[in-house]
């Protein structure tokens, strides 16, 4: 089967952290955000807001809070994608339906909305020759993000996104085989042999890539990432912002 241009673009996705010192074209960011808004949204609630961060001081503070990710400071654009139930609450009150009560379903719908929008923005950016990287590290110290961006109650920063013109090509990380992801009629445990084969493939990738070479495989890298990024403060933070209260 021949891939379409869109499919090829999706399969070639890679994270870009090194950018040329070159701004986006006038109006380009607004087009990308419009493409993001075209993503599916639960019940058309559009529960997202995006903060464009241009202040060098704010970028630096966020970069430090995110674990020293200096590309936040250097990218042509840095965006913070937020789950926004504040605007939804405003609409509910305007319609005479009362205030939101922090139901988990509402929070989950907002999180999904933001994720879908973010992926649409990234794909649209890559279609124009831009590159970027998602920044989950803003959840390390989310209260810093709230303070820096003056985020009100019922607005939660979920992830950041650096965008710009790539300064260098990076390798595409090998994904798991489709057979390990696509199940039929019922869930199936991953075949240990298939997992071992994938670990071997990732081990070769990590050892031979152009930067950040390391001796690891998918299982060990994943275990290290999950155990090292528990972010035990997140649930309390979300509830303090009016999310997942009940």
Please provide the spans of the model-predicted regions.
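Acidic, surface-exposed loops and disordered segments
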Residues: 1-246
């Amino acid at each position: 089967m021949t891939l379409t241009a869109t499919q090829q673009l999706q399969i070639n996705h890679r994270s870009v952290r090194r950018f040329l010192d070159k701004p986006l074209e006038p109006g380009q960011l607004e087009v990308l955000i419009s493409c993001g808004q075209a993503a599916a949204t639960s019940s058309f609630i559009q529960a997202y807001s995006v903060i464009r961060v241009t202040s060098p001081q704010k970028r630096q503070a966020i970069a430090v809070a995110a674990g020293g990710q200096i590309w936040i400071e250097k990218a042509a654009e840095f965006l913070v994608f937020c789950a926004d139930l504040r605007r939804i609450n405003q609409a509910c009150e305007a319609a005479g339906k009362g205030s939101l009560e922090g139901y988990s379903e509402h929070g989950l719908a907002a999180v999904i909305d933001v994720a879908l929008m973010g992926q649409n923005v990234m794909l649209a950016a890559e279609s124009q020759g831009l590159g970027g990287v998602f920044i989950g590290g803003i959840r390390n110290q989310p209260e810093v993000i709230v303070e820096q961006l003056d985020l009100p109650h019922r607005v939660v920063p979920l992830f950041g996104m650096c965008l710009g013109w790539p300064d260098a090509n990076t390798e595409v990380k090998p994904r798991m085989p489709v057979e390990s992801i696509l199940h039929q009629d019922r869930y199936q445990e991953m075949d240990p042999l298939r997992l071992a084969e994938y670990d071997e493939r990732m081990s070769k990738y990590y050892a031979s890539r152009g930067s950040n070479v390391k001796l690891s495989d998918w299982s060990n890298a994943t275990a290290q990432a999950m155990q090292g990024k528990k972010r035990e403060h997140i649930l309390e933070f979300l509830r303090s912002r009016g999310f997942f209260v009940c």
